[in-house]
Curated annotation (Swiss-Prot):
This is Proline--tRNA ligase. Keywords: Aminoacyl-tRNA synthetase, ATP-binding, Cytoplasm, Ligase, Nucleotide-binding, Protein biosynthesis. Pfam families: HGTP_anticodon, tRNA-synt_2b, tRNA_edit. GO terms for biological process: prolyl-tRNA aminoacylation. It catalyses: tRNA(Pro) + L-proline + ATP = L-prolyl-tRNA(Pro) + AMP + diphosphate.
Length: 570
């Protein structure tokens, strides 16, 4: 491909709306264009990367015994009603009606449709096990689409579904998919950690996520370098601490004027935040007030709280609601003289803490040296604290590491979560009708483009890994008016094509500095610079990844690059 004819136009200005490096660089390098919030066009170079990513995924899925098909984007309401998810999936589900008033959704995932397909086809145990997969566009009405391809409303996903006769067979399918995913991410050259995860809206018995480390991911991973434990931070259990042994001091009421935050209170009273009780009022289902109590040095993990409450329909109480329900202001909510209609949840972190600082439900006043048993009685203990660096590993007790990451893959052992309500049964060897045991396995294909850029970039631009780069080689002609250079560049370009290298020839009539800047920005793995060294019978080969440069004889240049490319793909 000649760059002068290729639909690749870089931007010189920094995209103002972009926060994540992948969002900024994909826009600036001319790989994507935004149509609307969370909706992006993939331009030719991005589409080339996408197709190479899909090829790697297909190869490993086919190798695992999975079979590719293509389901529909439009899913009828009736299928989703069978599982109850038409109502419970939430506002992320795009819903629409046709001209006859029949309701559909744009598939965010395809458990209902694939289960319906299999129940119409599979009758006997002889037809099982089977694993079916597709690479298909999905839609989710994200509340806050952000970071470009990281959190989009329209995206491409690989979703697979396994169907088995029993739990043992289902676990074999699950492990096969787990192994396939590990091979996929290894071949994509992505640094990915497999972590235990919550089953969430999909449901089921077991779940693992495959998370690529990046500062702009929406997931937090806690992992142990000692025993290898890894899990999404929202499911890491934090047990009750041991009861403190210090002597209980007399409770006192102290004046704390204009002190509104834990940090301010800690400084004012000269106490560590861990000695302060923090109280946060939530409104559940727009009617039920729930007061969550937690140690002052901890934060509430609202994903954990969602599981405790059994609903995601909750929010922080407004200033007006705090005043109406408790007669006080935020920052001064305490545990004394609470109305009977207030449900109180105690985070494990408060267990056994002595000489606490507790608000009075009275602005500008606190109690100090408040102690359990003597001054108050505990209520229901729950685990709603965010895990943090240094918390104990639930497996071995060693300090945990915590990093942000981007979920690229998610696998679920579903059991009969969908087959039972949808009556997807088969006749077993004993002649009895039984529900099919299912699993589902997703990979965010378009999101992988963002993850690759997140992990492979520098201050100059993208550094695509060779196996998925839009082009493996960029031949840069420094002077389009120099016939000798031009002839050498043309010869190298044709030779590269003949030898199967995915090559782009920068034949544009631009300055060398302009071409080098573009080459750095778009990030092709190798470049051959055709310049003044041609008179010595040489060209310069450069590696975008390492910055290495080699002066190579013109006749050997393409073979030299081809060898480098083959090494990268091993």
């Amino acid at each position: 491909m000649r760059w002068s004819r290729y639909f690749l136009y870089t931007e010189k200005e920094e995209p103002k709306e972009a926060e994540a490096p992948s969002h900024r660089l994909l826009l600036k390098a001319g790989f994507i264009k935004q149509v609307s919030a969370g909706i992006y066009e993939l331009l030719p170079p991005a589409y080339k990367v996408l197709k190479k990513v899909e090829s790697i995924i297909r190869k490993e899925m086919d190798r695992s015994g999975a079979q590719e098909l293509l389901l529909t984007v439009l899913n009828p309401k009736e299928l989703w009603e069978e599982t109850g998810r038409w109502e419970t999936y939430g506002e992320e589900l795009f819903k629409l009606k046709d001209r006859n008033g029949r309701e559909y959704c744009l598939g965010p995932t395809h458990e209902e449709e694939i289960t319906d397909l299999v129940r119409r086809v599979v009758r006997s145990y002889r037809q099982l096990p089977v694993i079916l997969y597709q690479i298909q566009v999905k839609f989710r009405d994200e509340k806050r689409p952000r970071f470009g391809l990281i959190r989009a409303r329209e995206f491409i996903m690989k979703d697979a579904y396994s169907f088995d006769t029993d739990d043992m067979s289902a676990m074999i399918s699950y492990e096969a998919m787990k192994f396939a995913y590990q091979r996929i991410f290894n071949k994509l050259r992505l640094n990915v950690i497999m972590a235990e995860a919550d089953v969430g809206q999909i449901g089921g018995k077991m779940s693992h996520e495959f998370i690529a480390f990046t500062d702009y991911g929406e997931a937090k991973v806690a992992y142990c370098e000692n025993c290898g434990y890894a899990a999404n931070a929202e499911i890491v259990p934090l047990p009750k601490p041991e009861e403190e042994k210090e002597e209980e001091k007399p409770m006192e009421k102290v004046h704390t004027p204009n002190v509104h935050t834990i940090e301010e209170l800690s400084k004012f009273l000269d106490v560590h935040p861990s000695k302060i009780m923090k109280a946060v009022l939530y409104i559940v289902n727009e009617k039920e007030p729930v007061l969550v109590l937690i140690r002052g040095d901890r934060e509430i993990d609202e994903n954990k709280l969602e599981k405790v409450l059994g609903t995601d329909n909750f929010r922080l109480a407004t200033d007006e609601e705090v005043q109406e329900l408790l007669g006080t202001k935020k920052g001064f909510i305490g545990i004394f003289n609470l109305p009977e209609n207030i449900k109180v949840l105690w985070d494990n972190s408060l267990y056994g803490v002595k000489n606490l600082v507790v608000a009075l439900n009275e602005p500008d006043w606190h109690y100090i040296n408040v102690n359990p048993g003597r001054d108050f009685q505990y209520g229901e203990f729950v685990d709603v604290a965010e895990v943090r660096e240094g918390d104990p590993c639930p497996k071995c007790g060693s300090p945990l590491k915590v990093r942000r990451g981007l979920e690229l893959g998610h696998i679920f052992l579903l059991g009969t979560r969908y087959s039972e309500p949808m009556k997807a049964y088969f006749t077993d060897r004993d002649g009895k009708e039984k529900p099919i045991i299912m699993g589902c396995y997703g990979i965010g294909v378009s999101r992988i483009l963002a993850a690759l850029v997140e992990q492979y970039h520098d201050d100059k631009g993208i550094k695509w890994p060779t196996p998925v780069a839009p082009f493996e080689l960029d031949i840069i002609l420094l002077n389009t008016k120099d016939e000798e250079m031009k002839n050498v560049a043309e010869k190298l370009y044709l030779e590269a094509e003949e030898k199967g290298i995915d090559v782009i020839f920068d034949d544009r009539e631009e300055s060398p500095g302009f071409k080098f800047a573009d080459a750095d920005l778009v990030g092709f793995p190798y470049r051959i610079v055709v310049g003044k060294k041609v008179k010595e019978g040489k060209v310069e080969v450069q590696s975008r990844h390492t910055g290495e440069k080699w002066d190579v004889e013109i006749e050997k240049a393409i073979d030299f690059v081809k060898e480098k490319i083959e090494e990268d793909k091993k």
